[in-house]
Amino acid sequence: MNRFDVWLVMKNIEKGRVVDNIGLCAILSPDELNDLPNLIVAPMTREFEDLPSRIEFEFEKNKGFIMLDQLRSIEKNNFIKKMGELESKVQPQLCSCLQEFFAL
């Protein structure tokens, strides 16, 4: 499990607005934190919403959006199957958006 890997994940159910319980997520945790029991992920969707925290991507010839406004920490035992890796041109966009998102 590495940063920018795409996994099929059983997401934690939360109250309120919840993205589907099982779905694709991009790992955002730095690889240096791989020894921890949880990883920080961003869910992925095909539904467009005009938000600055949504990063457009293409994965397996399908377009979609990484939802940085839906970040969550997921236990490793909820990771079902590795599906691939985010394309390299999206990775710096993610990092830049996260830096802006969490700017103090």
Name each model feature, range by range.
Residues 1-104:
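Conserved functional hotspots at enzyme active or ligand-binding sites that engage polyanionic ligands
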